[in-house]
């Protein structure tokens, strides 16, 4: 019955896509040339989704340049819907509306990324120094967002030579150096890029070196020293209307870290840890695409390694984890009078390898998953005020476990978002999706502590998700505002108990609303966001144990940016607030209440008139030296003799100089 209902929904979505061929013409953009306005509030614009219009987040290159983020906490510091837990780089976990990013389809330059490997490590993330754009599509994600988009999608996009080259130039270089107090130490980034005879290339290096930071009370937080060593390389070639792009990203973090990076245990000790990530991809597109022929072909390979030395004679995080993910995508986009339709196939294989140094009766485990899917997504904008984004995909999933037991199944996913624009200032929308997730392995690192008898339950089944959202957008030439109500439910997730891998019986749910507003006046931009979310497992609130689902309660941000062109200056500030969290379930599980906190960051930037290619910047994080731990961190607890959170850094100044040639 469940499959039949899903098939009916998928068929309805596909029929809606086809039926729009009889619809009216798309509404044309009537904005006057040179007029300064915010992005239109409509959910569809020129055949593309407007992520922000449905409660999502978009960070442009200009946004990222303003923030100059040293880590992902600073990258998302202006987004109340996104929480990042504290600690050193490899320990940071990203939660969207209280759901860890592994529940979303995460990609870098279109390449799918692996999920979080172990519940005591951070989310797999890219170096913010390489980014030019980030999109966070919360809730109902499009069918072409990728496989397994249970709670939405996160799309990271890195810079290339064409983004950095000055107009009319064929070669350029950029050097950025900074020094930070409170353990931040030195950070350096260099980039060279060029263009010649249709060939463009870029090479960028970024490294950090520092010490453990101190929290607002002056206590050193172990295992938090910056230790990134990252490389980004890209090349593109255009010929006869064809374009080929090749990209390589290398990430290394090697330092002494806590046994369990997301929590402070009594008598905690640091041990060497290396986290490595390598990604290679090649993509083919057309520069002379037509309405009926706009192809994209992509192949990729990702490798993620977690290595920790054998520091004790039992399983406790001393292990080796290796993942290989490879696959590809073939799609074509059709442009018609009223929008665009994208259709294609994607596929991937994910290999897992674990080594626990022989601290139980099985040292090594190898297992894998495979996926093949077909998808279509249509995005339409009509002159009667309606816009529609709808699509479907069908996937096959296969799981072969460490005992050579094989599980396979297939399922359909469907999504749709419909909006109506009353006038140029008001738009309402509603959307829903039902997503088939295949076999979800989640934090597979659990198996390092399981013995040889550990097996997969024969009834182990694929996961599934449902998303609902609705809202209203308001806007004008210099202001915008919106409210989005959301409800996400995910079931069929894995449960690694002491005897077997099976399905978690609980349905996890995040529901609530987000608010956003922005106003632009001459050289001043003011913005604010607010998020209220209730995250539950079954009927109970989730526990603040740094899991895949975390309580976030009420969170808000307020920011301002001011340009001072007469002095070649820019200044800005961000305020982030999180409300107090207290619930009976957490108290019964020996967690303390989570106190409210308010944190202020600020920056000032200057371009000396005598040296136009130089920028000087000073920034301060946690201006008032608040002693706090970021929401979604492991909360303090009486368990295990007393658990402390990984406290966030106290006041930290950063001084930066940048040259561009």
UniProtKB/Swiss-Prot annotation:
It comes from Brucella ovis (strain ATCC 25840 / 63/290 / NCTC 10512). Keywords: Cell outer membrane, Membrane, Receptor, Signal, TonB box, Transmembrane, Transmembrane beta strand, Transport. Residues 48-159 form the TBDR plug domain. Induction: Induced in absence of iron. Residues 170-661 form the TBDR beta-barrel domain. It is a multi-pass membrane protein. This is Heme transporter BhuA. Residues 1-23 form the signal peptide. GO terms for molecular function: siderophore uptake transmembrane transporter activity. Heme transporter. The keyword Transport applies. Belongs to the TonB-dependent receptor family. SUPFAM superfamilies: Porins. The keyword Membrane applies. It is found in: Cell outer membrane. Pfam families: Plug (PF07715), TonB_dep_Rec_b-barrel (PF00593).
